Curated annotation (Swiss-Prot):
PANTHER family cross-referenced by the UniProt entry: OS05G0510400 PROTEIN-RELATED (PTHR31215)
Stated name of the protein: F-box protein At5g46170
Domain F-box, first and last residues per copy: 24-72
Lineage: superkingdom: Eukaryota
GO biological process, one term: heat acclimation
Native organism taxonomy: Eukaryota, Viridiplantae, Streptophyta, Embryophyta, Tracheophyta
Stretch list, region Disordered: 122-158
Compositional bias segments (type: Low complexity): 125-142
InterPro entries: AUF1-like, F-box-like_dom_sf, F-box_dom
Length: 395
């Protein structure tokens, strides 16, 4: 006779597992205002792009960020023969007297400026917020792209115009280039800071033929005193006069090259920022600088609005803003020793304003405050010396 053994229920039925509880996302308890505060502290456009892909909520909040920093990893330019020939053909038809001077005096910076122009191209594409901010570690562009991006070595590069396209409420924008446009020799100091509206408002240039770092022994001794002793040739004993050798050994010519080069670099940056300024009408401040600290272009809210309202005077042949006729003031010291022991050889400070500027000529506070330390101190020391006035025609 067969014996039937009753089948027992599975253990899961005898001891059922407790229902799984959903993990709590604590970010859901944070109000949007707090998250936006965090995103504004982050600032970096590529990091914000990565935040976009975390959640739908983050994706919807990132476009509302008002403080954005674009750090450019590389500047890509087409160096093949076809690109070079096309550049030559375009520039050849518009070559004029200034073009000849430009090539003669500052030919060394033509190629970097062309690369900057290609980097800040105005092509547009319909990409998402997440894609535009995080799909590449390099933000760059060549001149002949379609859609504001280019592939190089399997990496997609984007233009700032494309990257910033989906940010709706930017108030403070900072773009940092990987290096300055002006190729200078090792040991040479060249810094500039320019402000623009629809054209140049002012520019300050600080240069030195060489920089001698502080001697530790002299610095320690200086800390024990309450006075700063200027190096020979930098004090008031010579009344700040420029020595005759400055005119005969090429010193003046070199300063002219520094000035023209800096103005061209500044006006090229300004010209290439137009698409971003036109699109982002909420901007209160725009800064275009470089990681070398060589040049800084600044625009405040009034200056940004002026550019939108007034037509831009542009030099289309060289892709830059037309520089107006200028009044310049120059200060020079053969040797300038700073309080920290740094010595500047051939220290030169140039303050530039348009000839038609209605601002008070005697006010030079904007000159001495143009740079960060230790160069702010250098500027303050130089403006106490004899002033030399120069003029420059529009170019």
């Amino acid at each position: 006779m067969a014996v039937i053994i009753p089948r027992s229920d599975p253990p899961s039925r005898i001891h059922p597992e407790p229902p799984q509880t959903l993990e709590i996302d604590h970010f859901d308890h944070l109000p949007d205002s707090i998250l936006l505060l965090v995103f504004n502290k982050i600032g970096d456009v590529k990091a914000l792009g990565r935040c976009c892909v975390v959640s739908r909520r983050f994706h919807s909040l990132v476009p509302q960020v008002d403080n954005v920093v674009v750090r450019v990893d590389c500047v890509i330019s087409d160096d093949d023969s076809s690109s070079l020939s096309s550049i030559k053909s375009r520039s050849g038809s518009s070559a004029g007297s200034f073009s000849a001077i430009f090539r003669l005096v500052v030919g060394g910076i033509v190629k970097p400026l062309q690369a900057l122009g290609q980097f800040l191209g105005t092509k547009r594409s319909s990409s998402s917020c997440g894609g535009s901010g995080s799909s590449s570690s390099s933000l760059s562009i060549s001149g002949d792209d379609d859609g504001g991006e280019i592939e190089q070595g399997g990496v997609t590069h984007h233009s700032p115009t494309q990257v910033l396209k989906n940010f709706d409420e930017i108030r403070y924008l900072r773009i940092e280039l990987p290096s300055g446009e002006l190729g200078i020799d090792d040991g040479v100091l060249l810094k500039w800071r320019a402000e623009f509206g629809s054209t140049l408002d002012n520019c300050v240039i600080l240069g030195a033929s060489s920089v001698i770092p502080p001697n530790p022994m002299r610095v320690s001794q200086a800390c024990d005193t309450t006075t700063v002793v200027e190096a020979p040739g930098s004090g008031s004993d010579d009344n700040g006069s420029i020595p005759e050798s400055f005119y005969t050994n090429g010193g003046l010519k070199l300063r002219v090259v520094w000035t023209i080069s800096s103005l061209i670099a500044a006006s090229a940056r300004h010209y290439l920022l137009q698409p971003i300024i036109a699109e982002h009408k909420t901007l209160d401040s725009l800064v275009l600088t470089d990681s070398d600290g060589q040049g800084v272009l600044c625009m405040n809210r009034d200056q940004l609005e002026e550019l939108r309202v007034k037509p831009l005077a542009a030099s289309s042949a060289s892709k830059r803003t037309l520089v107006p006729a200028l009044n310049m003031r120059l200060w020079y010291a053969p040797t300038l020793e700073l309080p920290d022991g740094t010595v500047l050889k051939g220290a030169t400070l140039v303050a530039i304003r348009p000839s038609e500027s209605k601002k008070e000529v005697s006010d030079i506070s904007w000159v001495s405050s143009a740079f960060e330390e230790p160069y702010e101190t250098a500027a303050k020391m130089l403006v106490k010396r004899r002033t030399y006035c120069l003029e420059m025609n529009s170019f």
